[in-house]
């Protein structure tokens, strides 16, 4: 069984046509996940305008104990699902490489050029969603010094001179 987590109906239709050999289920919100029915599924997550990380959605996915998770994202997030095998792929992956990845054979999938820790991605998502510093500190339960350290590292990784340049960053749609 394949669970496709996306808000993009065109993306789901394309995945359904590519994965015609199996049972394909479209999931748009966390209430649609059935822990018993979808147990040990193969999960495909599209993060474009659908940032499921750091939410109840991700904990629901973890409870499914998926066989493998493929995430369409320009970011590589280290240990985002604990011990569940996760592969991050760009949306520009070829169909041949994607099918090879699904079948478990070797393919030359280009890795994301931006690799973040789980906490860095969480801080970045909060900043992209225009949360205030105080709200971020309260939500993530971190100190101001830790926040500034994460913010500085994120700016270095993304090549930003000022954090407000994040609004014009090419991958901002994957964070909201």
Curated annotation (Swiss-Prot):
Protein role: May act as a transcriptional regulator of dctA.
Domain HTH luxR-type: 109-174
Cystine pairings recorded for this chain: none
Induction info: By acidic conditions. Could be induced by EvgA via the induction of YdeO.
Keyword Phosphoprotein: no
InterPro entries xrefs: Sig_transdc_resp-reg_C-effctor, Tscrpt_reg_LuxR_C, WH-like_DNA-bd_sf
Gene Ontology biological process terms in this record: regulation of DNA-templated transcription
Coiled coil: none
Species classification: Bacteria, Pseudomonadati, Pseudomonadota, Gammaproteobacteria, Enterobacterales
Record keywords, A-Z: DNA-binding, Transcription, Transcription regulation
Annotated source species: Shigella flexneri
Superkingdom to which the source organism belongs: Bacteria
A GO MF label: DNA binding
SMART domains in the record: HTH_LUXR
Name the record gives this protein: HTH-type transcriptional regulator DctR
DNA-binding region: 133-152
A Pfam family: GerE
């Amino acid at each position: 069984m394949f669970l496709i987590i996306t808000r993009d109906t065109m993306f789901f239709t394309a995945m359904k046509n590519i994965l015609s050999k199996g049972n394909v289920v479209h999931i748009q919100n966390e209430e649609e996940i059935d822990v018993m029915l979808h147990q040990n599924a193969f999960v495909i997550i599209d993060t474009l305008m659908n940032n499921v990380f750091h939410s109840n959605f991700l904990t629901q996915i973890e409870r499914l104990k998926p066989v493998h998770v493929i995430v369409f994202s320009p970011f590589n997030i280290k240990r985002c699902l604990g011990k569940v095998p996760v592969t991050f792929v760009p949306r520009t992956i070829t169909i041949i490489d994607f099918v090879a990845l699904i079948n478990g054979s070797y393919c030359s999938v280009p890795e994301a050029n931006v690799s973040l820790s789980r906490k860095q991605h969480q801080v970045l998502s909060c900043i992209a969603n225009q949360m205030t510093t105080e709200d971020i500190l309260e939500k993530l339960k971190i100190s101001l010094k830790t926040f500034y350290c994460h913010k500085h590292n994120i700016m270095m990784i993304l090549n930003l001179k000022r954090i407000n340049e994040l609004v014009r960053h090419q991958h901002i749609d994957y964070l909201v």
